[in-house]
């Protein structure tokens, strides 16, 4: 294979999957075949999309009812020649799913890149090992928390929140994705003030915390804003990838003047991936493509919390982020939304140690504040790694958290 293989889930009311697959392969490449003169067929043969797999799936009555018609479900795979597109994500996505995304019940499930094509993508700059080296934490999951309620608040409020989270043992504190450039907490002031707080906590408590600052603005201003953040001392850049595009992420990741990790937020991605019938699969969008484009971290809905993703999908995202690939470093999985300490055993059981446990209300909503919330999570992480049930741990902060949010992992064993 020298190009790319696209895998689709299709629902076809013509009930002829082979014909539908061939129509897609031709429609996204040379447009027609059977009516072309033989000489022209020979000339265009190297540009033709090739159907390499057609598999019929069991009928879904629920799907038929939803669509109000009877359809045949199937998985098809089509190989697109590298000659047809430039080696960049806009060209690849337009080739494999451009106008097809408008053509009925078709979902892009996966893209398989040839080795030659992979070489055109940067992958994570730091990856899991690089992030762990920055923190000098190698034996446990990382703990991340989120600034909450920052809109309309000043730098003093930010510093207080940041200090409490760092003292609580949090490894990374990130901006809320809806915190943009503003007069009260401008980008560089957040970074400079935040670094002062984190340095003070490190000197006093010996715990290192990194700050992920939200880089925002108009697309053509992003690089300059990112470089300003780096010059001010930013540890990590949080980026709302899908409000801008994967290629914008790649351009940031490839820039040598932006030598910091990038954390990809999934905001807007639901518009692409939420449907079971249309769009792009979550594992491809939030896993493989983010990793290829340069994300060191990928946030996505966990299978447990308030914005739950199906467990199979969440694990598939993580697989794409962390599977061995000689071309790319591994990215951190960050299952998120509604996470509290009682979920820690589930997260470690399902995602392993190389995961970032991300909490907002589960830290800030603790009766002992963010310090108590952070400590409750750290205790839950340590207990889980020792295979000790959380309800048996004698720790006031963890006990308080379990009383508030419950202990659904009561019987979980690693």
From Swiss-Prot:
It comes from Bacillus cereus (strain ZK / E33L). SUPFAM superfamilies: RuBisCo, C-terminal domain, RuBisCO, large subunit, small (N-terminal) domain. InterPro entries: Diketo-Methiopentyl-P_enolase, RuBisCO, RuBisCO_lsu_C, RuBisCO_lsu_C_sf, RuBisCO_lsu_fd_N, RuBisCO_lsu_N_sf. The gene is mtnW. Its EC number is 5.3.2.5. Disulfide bonds: none annotated. Gene3D superfamilies: Ribulose bisphosphate carboxylase, large subunit, C-terminal domain, RuBisCO large subunit, N-terminal domain. Binds 1 Mg(2+) ion per subunit. One of its GO terms (molecular function) is ribulose-bisphosphate carboxylase activity. Pathway: Amino-acid biosynthesis; L-methionine biosynthesis via salvage pathway; L-methionine from S-methyl-5-thio-alpha-D-ribose 1-phosphate: step 3/6. Belongs to the RuBisCO large chain family. Type IV subfamily. This is 2,3-diketo-5-methylthiopentyl-1-phosphate enolase. Homodimer. The modification N6-carboxylysine is found at residue 174. Its cofactor is Mg(2+).
């Amino acid at each position: 294979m020298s190009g790319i293989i696209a895998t689709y889930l299709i629902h076809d009311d013509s009930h002829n999957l082979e014909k539908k697959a061939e129509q897609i392969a031709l429609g996204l490449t040379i447009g027609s075949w059977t009516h072309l003169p033989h000489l022209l067929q020979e000339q265009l043969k190297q540009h033709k999309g090739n159907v390499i797999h057609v598999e019929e799936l069991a009928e879904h009555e629920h799907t038929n009812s939803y669509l109000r018609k009877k359809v045949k479900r199937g998985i098809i795979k089509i190989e697109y020649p590298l000659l047809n597109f430039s080696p960049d994500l806009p060209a690849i996505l337009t080739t494999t799913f451009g106008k097809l995304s408008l053509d009925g019940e078709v979902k892009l499930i996966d893209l398989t890149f040839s080795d030659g094509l992979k070489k055109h993508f940067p992958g994570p700059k730091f990856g899991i090992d690089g992030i762990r080296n920055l923190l000098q934490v190698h034996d446990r999951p990382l703990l991340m928390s989120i600034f909450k309620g920052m809109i309309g608040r000043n730098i003093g409020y930010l510093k207080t929140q940041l200090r409490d989270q760092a003292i609580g043992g949090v490894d990374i504190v990130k901006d809320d994705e809806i915190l943009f450039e503003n007069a009260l907490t401008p980008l560089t002031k957040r970074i400079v003030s935040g670094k002062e707080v984190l340095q003070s906590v490190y000197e006093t408590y010996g715990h290192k915390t990194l700050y992920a600052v939200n880089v925002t603005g108009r697309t053509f201003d992003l690089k300059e804003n990112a470089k300003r953040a780096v010059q001010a001392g930013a540890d990590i850049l949080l980026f709302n990838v899908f409000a801008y595009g994967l290629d914008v992420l790649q351009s940031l990741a490839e820039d040598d003047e932006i030598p910091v990790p990038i954390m990809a937020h999934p905001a807007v991605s639901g518009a692409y991936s939420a449907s079971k019938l249309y769009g792009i699969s979550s594992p491809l969008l939030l896993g493989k493509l983010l990793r290829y484009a340069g994300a060191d971290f990928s946030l996505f809905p966990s299978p447990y919390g308030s914005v739950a993703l199906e467990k199979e999908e969440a694990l598939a995202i993580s697989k794409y982020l962390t599977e061995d690939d000689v071309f790319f470093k591994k990215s951190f999985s960050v299952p998120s939304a509604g996470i509290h300490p009682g979920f820690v055993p589930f997260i470690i059981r399902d995602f392993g140690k190389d995961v970032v446990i991300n909490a907002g209300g589960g830290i800030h909503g603790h009766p002992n504040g963010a310090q108590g919330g952070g400590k409750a999570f750290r205790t839950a992480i340590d207990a889980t790694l020792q295979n000790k049930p959380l309800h048996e741990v004698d720790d006031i902060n963890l006990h308080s958290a379990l009383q508030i949010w419950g202990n659904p992992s009561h019987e979980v064993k690693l």
